[in-house]
Amino acid sequence: MSTIGSPTGNPGHSSPQAFFTDLVIYLSVMFLVREVYFSEIGFIANGLMWSLTTLAVATWRMRARGVSWKDLGLRRPTNYKVALIATVFILGLAPVLVVLFSVMSDQLALVVAPDNSAERAVSRFGDLRGNWLLFLTIIPFIWLESMLEELLDRGVLINWIERMLSNKLFATIFAVIAQAAIFGFRHSHDLSERSITVGLIGLAMGIGYVAFGRNLWPLIAAHCALNTLSMLDRVN
């Protein structure tokens, strides 16, 4: 099991400046590609196009640094019990963080923009209410997107930020927080209830990643489960 302060892989003699350059390229593509939208193919297909484009850039920079997806955690768990615990931990921590934020925002009278994602759901996914055929048609693509987000937001971002900051414990803490903020902002380009909620889910994923051996499969399982529950709620 990797320690919290030790990113996996062998980056060779690459300098922190090299990883900084990689991050500039990577994040630029991650955000700018979302400006390209083909209305003819719908939101899900566009989302996959964005993620696959970012995946291609990530793979390119990983090869330049001598790092593989297996190094970042896309490998069979060495201990399935730990993997299961990690999945349950994430599924438990994510709602706890969201509830804690809700309580704190009420106590501190914080004002953020409301979550309007439900209003956009029909235009993005179609009318799912009572439509099990539509649900079964799109859920495999939702799972694929969930997997891609874990590779890109946890696997790449956490490890690259750590290496940019020379792999100190502070670097890991900062990386987990930074990727969560980026994850939230990428889903809603504002300081809103949705961006904060998604960011807190990303924080739970990041904590689970570094605390349980840096294997991506528990995160992928948890992410798929959360998105499945969200889609089921729209069906019912």
Where would I find each of the regions flagged by the language model?
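Short, Lys/Arg-rich, polar N-terminal cytosolic tail immediately upstream
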Residues: 1-14
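Hydrophobic, aromatic-rich alpha-helical transmembrane segments
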Residues: 11-20, 40-44, 48, 75-87, ...
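Alpha-helical transmembrane segments in multi-pass membrane proteins
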Residues: 16-67
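Alpha-helical transmembrane segments of polytopic integral membrane proteins
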Residues: 30, 55, 62-66, 97, ...
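Juxtamembrane membrane-interface segments at transmembrane alpha-helix termini
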Residues: 36-38, 57-67, 86, 207-215, ...
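Juxtamembrane helix-loop-helix connectors linking adjacent transmembrane helices
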Residues: 69-145, 163-166
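Transmembrane helix-loop-helix hairpins at the membrane interface
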Residues: 130-236
